[in-house]
Regions:
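Consensus positions within tandem repeat domains that build extended binding/scaffold surfaces
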Residues: 20-23, 43-46, 68-70, 91-93, ...
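A short, hydrophobic secondary-structure junction motif
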Residues: 23, 125-128
Length: 220
């Protein structure tokens, strides 16, 4: 059973298993959604552009976010909890959620975690930051950051710890509020040196910049 279209007054029936693509997209008056037990999948763009959405309750039966931008541009959303059964999501699940400050993952989840209150979704096995937000701290132990993990987020400052070995292209794409970027001095892959940027040491390639960036003369 798949819900294909909803509105701000919809109460999702108990027998629904999937929230379809763009089912609630552009429901600008939707402020709260309770996804009932039994739902296992939320498809791409399901709640995209629900600009008033502040309160999201997800079921323990949820397993997958597919298609990306599931909560894209929910500009009023400030916090969300990922249930224990979720084992699949795209990195741009929260793209454009400029107010999102807190992301927590149920401690019983075997695929993802939000270690040390980092306010991000981490792939536990790969130590990969999958999805972040305005309030994310990239904690030590993270080895890589996914493409589009912070796409159009409200993040204002970024610190790359020594453990990060790979920042995928577009990981911080269109982060227009970001004003400060630093890299741990003993990071083997990247450097910053007070330039408000991330530069790959081996190639001198500018990987990440912001409005306050000073570009090294040696940057290629």
């Amino acid at each position: 059973n798949k819900l294909i279209l909803g509105c701000s007054s919809t109460i999702i029936p108990q027998d629904i298993e999937t929230i379809g693509e763009f089912a609630f997209s552009h429901c600008r008056n939707l402020q709260k959604i309770i996804v009932p037990e039994g739902v296992s999948c939320i498809a791409g763009g399901a709640f995209e552009y629900c600009s008033s959405l502040k309160d999201v309750v997800l079921p323990t039966t949820l397993e997958s976010f597919i298609g990306g931008s599931n909560f894209g541009y929910c500009t009023s959303l400030e916090s969300i909890t990922i249930p224990k059964g979720v084992c699949n999501m795209e990195s741009d699940i929260f793209c454009g959620c400029i107010s999102l400050q807190k992301i927590s993952v149920d401690s019983a989840n075997e695929t993802f975690d939000s270690r040390n209150n980092c306010n991000a979704v981490i792939d536990t096995e790969q130590n990969k930051l999958v999805a972040g937000c305005k309030g994310t701290v990239v904690v030590d132990g993270i080895k890589s950051i996914s493409s589009r993990a912070f796409y159009k987020s409200g993040i204002t400052s970024v610190h790359i710890p020594s453990s990060v070995e790979l920042i995928e292209p577009t990981a911080f794409k269109d982060c227009e509020y970001c004003m400060s970027i630093t890299v741990e001095e003993n990071n083997r892959t990247y450097k910053s040196a007070g330039s408000n940027s991330v530069v790959e040491k081996a190639t001198n390639e500018l990987v990440l910049a912001c409005t306050t960036t000073k570009i090294f003369p040696e940057v290629k």
